[in-house]
């Protein structure tokens, strides 16, 4: 039985025993919710999410394209592959560089 995490997302069908799962563990989510594309899934339990955004340059009164990569924890109950569009939510720091967790997978 998945618990309500306070976001408008569908809980996963599978269950897991991960302590850092927002649905089946003790991890609470708060703060930003970001959508991005999975760039890498080679780390154990962690994925890299890339996102593109526009940044305004005042001098030229134009926008420039920028990109960033974020590390996110990947719970075992969500099957995430490279190329998937995922929704990640901010949480407490899980490791040195991981402060987000995957909450929803939207297939490409």
Curated annotation (Swiss-Prot):
InterPro entries: NA-bd_OB-fold, Ribosomal_uS17, Ribosomal_uS17_arc/euk, Ribosomal_uS17_archaeal, Ribosomal_uS17_CS
This protein's GO CC annotations: cytosolic small ribosomal subunit
Keyword terms, alphabetized: Ribonucleoprotein, Ribosomal protein, RNA-binding, rRNA-binding
Alphabetized GO MF terms: rRNA binding; structural constituent of ribosome
Family annotation (CDD domains): Ribosomal_uS17
The UniProt record lists the keyword Ribosomal protein: yes
A GO BP annotation: translation
UniProt similarity note: Belongs to the universal ribosomal protein uS17 family.
Record's subunit section: Part of the 30S ribosomal subunit.
Role description: One of the primary rRNA binding proteins, it binds specifically to the 5'-end of 16S ribosomal RNA.
NCBIfam families per UniProt: PRK08572.1, uS17_arch
Protein name: Small ribosomal subunit protein uS17
Species per Swiss-Prot/TrEMBL record: Methanosphaerula palustris (strain ATCC BAA-1556 / DSM 19958 / E1-9c)
Source taxonomy: Archaea, Methanobacteriati, Methanobacteriota, Stenosarchaea group, Methanomicrobia
Gene that this polypeptide is encoded by: rps17
């Amino acid at each position: 039985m998945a618990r309500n995490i306070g976001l408008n997302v569908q809980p996963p069908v599978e269950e897991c025993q991960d302590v850092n799962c927002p649905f089946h563990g003790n991890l609470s989510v708060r703060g930003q919710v970001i959508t991005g594309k999975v760039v890498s899934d080679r780390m154990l339990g962690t994925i890299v999410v890339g996102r593109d955004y526009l940044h305004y340059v005042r001098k030229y009164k134009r926008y420039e394209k920028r990109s960033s990569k974020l590390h996110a924890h990947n719970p075992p109950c969500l099957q995430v592959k490279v190329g998937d569009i995922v929704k990640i939510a901010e949480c407490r720091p899980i490791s040195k560089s991981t402060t987000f967790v995957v909450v929803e997978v939207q297939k490409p």
